[in-house]
UniProtKB/Swiss-Prot annotation:
The lineage of its organism: Eukaryota, Metazoa, Chordata, Craniata, Vertebrata. One of its GO terms (cellular component) is cytosol. Component of the DREAM complex (also named LINC complex) at least composed of E2F4, E2F5, LIN9, LIN37, LIN52, LIN54, MYBL1, MYBL2, RBL1, RBL2, RBBP4, TFDP1 and TFDP2. The complex exists in quiescent cells where it represses cell cycle-dependent genes. It dissociates in S phase when LIN9, LIN37, LIN52 and LIN54 form a subcomplex that binds to MYBL22. Interacts with CCNF (via the Cyclin N-terminal domain). Residues 212-287, 391-412 are annotated as: Disordered. Residues 213-229 have a biased composition (Polar residues). It is found in: Nucleus. Keywords: DNA-binding, Isopeptide bond, Nucleus, Phosphoprotein, Repeat, Transcription, Transcription regulation, Ubl conjugation. One of its GO terms (biological process) is mitotic spindle assembly. The modification Phosphothreonine is found at residues 266, 440, 444, 487, 494, 505, 520. This is Myb-related protein B. It comes from Homo sapiens (Human). Phosphorylated by cyclin A/CDK2 during S-phase. Phosphorylation at Thr-520 is probably involved in transcriptional activity. Residues 26-77, 78-133, 134-184 form the HTH myb-type domain. A motif (Bipartite nuclear localization signal) lies at residues 564-584.
Length: 700
């Protein structure tokens, strides 16, 4: 029975009718249903302005677009639209047009039927006029299939209808809502369906990761399979609880290899699938969908397809290697291609099995394999109150023979490095296999963080700030904490091999690494003299500083020690050290001489004692320094006056001495040169014409 998909006829989308009128419109302003007032307004506008400009008509509706208005008129409000029952003439016309144009050109067929849409013609054909549609009464077998399929698929009526040849999805839905649902709710249908009837198996396909989709029925084979094997693998389920589902798959003892292979090959009696694959030709594995057989009794069993048959052939070729489940390990994040209906079971097995040489099935010792399922897997498997079987695929390697390529879900388990304690290293009884088994968790592994995330938040405090600003020095400090500006770095010109005659512990980096390095020529030249070290200043520091200031800033640095002859008359024992501080040379030479001269003129009673605090001496020096900075040396001719002023501190409350006439004359511009310059300036300003923006300067 051919079915039409939703996107077969694109030009018919303009004439489809829905409740909201805008299900396929992505740019719609409003997805609410049309009101009666809107319908009346649209009728009046179409009657007044016609159907030419739908944008103009949509401008009268604040929440409607032009497409919404057009769809509403053509599918619902158009008076020429026929919504009544179909006549015999219309049915006969549809049958003739379908024979002529096929079941795809519904828009073209609707043009031959006045007042009918393409959607109406399509539904009339598929639901009533199609000769393949059954119109007979529903049988008990069909009711049982619908009930069991509804438990698995839910309200997916199109897929359920594919399991019943001759029944449409609309008919199945109506029959469920009218008859079967009432029986299921009352419990009468369940008692009738358990009367020793074989279970129903539903063939489903997983195509392109789109979830469960039922297979298309073909000639000679339907989707309903009643001749499934007499003893299929089942799971006893009394209550659909996660604990019982986990317990059903938790413990399972391995049988000998013969019985193990028989259990895997149980779906073999289904002979219709290999025949179908042989008839149609085996497509490549990439395009072959996954096939599953859903038992109505709540199981999901993999059907025998080409991929499963290839896996069985590989297992038969080398059963010893394929049955060693200790080589299998599931990845943490499976890919999307390997996920079945967006849920993949993550298995972790702890194996206690001795490794035996291959090709010895009789010597194989049975062992116990445990499987653990996490909560998400159990919830996915128990969805719709039905459990599912979990398929297990073989490993990537086939006993070293490398035959074929098994599924990529399983990978070879990586060897783990085990850090043994000294006691364990000396013991010879512990094997590598036992150590791996001891690492296998006995419950669902949960990765715990070795730290708390809150350790990285709010960790900064005042103590850390102080430690960063002034960290405590170790026994071998790498560098000084504060760089002294006046202490430059000099490179020692002595080669390293001539510096130390005694033995020096070599650097660990270079003692351990004997491989030749290829430093640059500049590094080669610098490594000869060693690293930079702070060395004491040389006696030529002042000369170098004067040369730099003279060349760059044009400043001539004059040091008083070289000018004044009194310093050369001192005794050799009282001479200064040739190494001088730069700040003394720049600022304190002149002040030092004046202080010494003043201190020599002061009486002994006023001289400062040697035990005076340092702040008083600094006060005296700063005051004299300020005096020298304010006055030019040309005004410091009266040395006895300065000494006399310094002698005044005998009485602390006396008034200061009045200003001398000579000082007043110089300070107030009363000298002859100053008066001459003032007169010249007055004459120059008098010649200038006053302007509106200029200021008036009044000279008295």
């Amino acid at each position: 029975m051919s079915r039409r998909t939703r996107c077969e006829d694109l030009d018919e989308l303009h004439y489809q009718d829905t409740d909201s009128d805008v299900p396929e419109q992505r740019d719609s302003k409003c997805k609410v249903k049309w009101t009666h007032e809107e319908d009346e307004q649209l009728r009046a506008l179409v009657r007044q302005f016609g159907q030419q400009d739908w944008k103009f008509l949509a401008s009268h509706f604040p929440n409607r677009t032009d497409q919404q208005c057009q769809y509403r008129w053509l599918r619902v409000l158009n008076p020429d639209l026929v919504k009544g029952p179909w006549t015999k003439e219309e049915d006969q016309k549809v049958i003739e047009l379908v024979k002529k144009y096929g079941t795809k050109q519904w828009t073209l067929i609707a043009k031959h039927l006045k007042g009918r849409l393409g959607k109406q013609c399509r539904e009339r054909w598929h639901n009533h006029l199609n000769p393949e549609v059954k119109k007979s009464c529903w049988t008990e077998e069909e009711d049982r299939i619908i009930c069991e399929a509804h438990k698995v698929l839910g309200n997916r009526w199109a897929e359920i209808a594919k399991m019943l040849p001759g029944r449409t999805d609309n008919a199945v839905k109506n029959h469920w809502n009218s008859t079967i649902k009432r029986k299921v709710d009352t419990g009468g249908f369940l008692s009738e369906s358990k009367d020793c009837k074989p279970p129903v198996y539903l063939l489903l396909e997983l195509e392109d990761k789109d979830g469960l989709q039922s297979a298309q029925p073909t000639e000679g084979q339907g989707s309903l399979l009643t001749n499934w094997p007499s003893v299929p693998p089942t799971i006893k389920e009394e209550e659909n609880s996660e604990e019982e589902l986990a317990a059903a798959t938790t413990s399972k003892e391995q049988e000998p290899i013969g019985t193990d292979l028989d259990a895997v090959r149980t779906p073999e009696p289904l002979e219709e699938f290999p025949k179908r694959e042989d008839q149609e030709g085996s497509p490549p594995e990439t395009s072959l969908p996954y096939k599953w057989v859903v038992e109505a009794a709540n199981l999901l069993i993999p059907a025998v397809g080409s991929s499963l048959s290839e896996a069985l052939d590989l297992i038969e070729s080398d059963p010893d290697a394929w049955c060693d489940l200790s080589k299998f390990d599931l990845p943490e994040e499976p890919s999307a291609e390997d996920s079945i209906n967006n849920s993949l079971v993550q298995l972790q097995a702890s194996h206690q099995q001795q490794v035996l040489p291959p090709r010895q099935p009789s010597a194989l010792v049975p062992s116990v394999t445990e499987y653990r399922l996490d909560g998400h897997t159990i919830s996915d498997l128990s969805r719709s109150s039905r459990g599912e079987l979990i398929p297990i695929s073989p490993s990537t390697e086939v006993g070293g023979s490398g035959i074929g390529t098994p599924p990529s879900v399983l990978k070879r388990q990586r060897k783990r490095r085990v850090a043994l304690s000294p006691v364990t290293e000396n013991s010879t009884s512990l094997s590598f296999l036992d150590s791996c088994n001891s690492l296998t968790p006995k419950s669902t592994p949960v990765k715990t963080l070795p730290f708390s995330p809150s350790q990285f938040l709010n960790f900064w405090n005042k103590q850390d700030t102080l430690e960063l600003e002034s960290p405590s020095l170790t026994s071998t400090p790498v560098c000084s904490q504060k760089v002294v500006v006046t202490t430059p770095l000099h490179r020692d010109k002595t080669p390293l091999h001539q510096k130390h005659a005694a033995f020096v512990t070599p650097d660990q980096k270079y003692s351990m690494d004997n491989t030749p390095h290829t430093p640059t020529p500049f590094k080669n030249a610098l490594e000869k003299y060693g690293p930079l070290k702070p060395l004491p200043q040389t006696p030529h520091l002042e000369e170098d500083l004067k040369e730099v200031l003279r060349s760059e800033a044009g400043i001539e640095l004059i040091i008083e020690d070289d000018i004044r002859p009194e310093k050369q008359k001192r005794k050799p024992g009282l001479r200064r050290s040739p190494i001088k501080k730069v700040r003394k040379s720049l600022a304190l030479d002149i002040v030092d001489e004046d202080v010494k001269l003043m201190m020599s003129t002061l009486p002994k009673s006023l001289s400062l004692p040697t035990t005076a605090p340092s702040n008083s001496s600094s006060l005296t020096l700063s005051g004299i320094k300020e005096d020298n900075s304010l006055l030019n040396q040309g005004f410091l001719q009266a040395k006895p006056e300065k000494a006399a002023v310094a002698q005044k501190p005998r009485s602390h409350f006396t008034t200061p001495a009045p200003m001398s006439s000579a000082w007043k004359t110089v300070a107030c511009g009363g000298t002859r040169d100053q008066l001459f310059m003032q007169e010249k300036a007055r004459q120059l300003l008098g010649r200038l014409k006053p302007s509106h923006t200029s200021r008036t300067l009044i000279l008295s």
